[in-house]
Amino acid sequence: MKSWVRVLLVLCGLALVPVIFLPMWRIDLVAPQYPEGLRLLIYPGKLGGNVDIINGLNHYIGMKTLHTEDFIEFTILPYLIGFFAAFFVVTGIIGKRKLMYALFFLFVSFGLLAIYDFWRWEYNYGHNLSPDAAIIVPGMAYQPPLIGFKQLLNFGAYSIPDQGGWIFVSAGAILLVCFIVEWRRASRISKGLAMAILVPVFLNSCSSGPQAISPGVD
């Protein structure tokens, strides 16, 4: 692999280490009665922000309360991020293209699985409502947006990556660039090697002049 690709991979791996301790995602809630806003912070290993206030509000509309211990993801996610941080660094140091390919496909697969898991949690959180809630709006669901803005009754909900999330996404984008560069470079090398093998064979098969006919042979 190119030297600058290897350096970028090592830097990405080092940048992923603080992600373990930073919030990866945030959901901001804005309403007239809360002009300063409420914020739910999602860390790799816990929930943070105004969790208690949000739980109190959600109780009235029948939503489940949020507790870190209810999510197995918070147990394994810090280790997965640590694994990818180490994988980035090792790949950059060793410099093997196949290692980078494996890293790329694992990283993309993890990202897609994480997005699906987050969407599934939001769906269950917003649709599985208690029938004994103090406030029931027929046909109303309170699923937060996966990303972007959504109006939920008198609350405006904004769902966006936080510090750790942006670092994680940036590492993925840099990995994609490195993957494309090395894939194209490997393709050019393969074509050049094929030509280097085929051209001498082709030239050797061509005669420089007419050959005499050998009686009893030709």
Model-derived features with residue positions:
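Juxtamembrane membrane-water interface segments of multi-pass membrane proteins
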Residues: L22-L29, G95-M100, L175-A194
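Hydrophobic alpha-helical transmembrane segments
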Residues: L11-A15, I72-I93, W166-L176
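A hydrophobic membrane-anchoring alpha-helix module
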Residues: Y158-R185
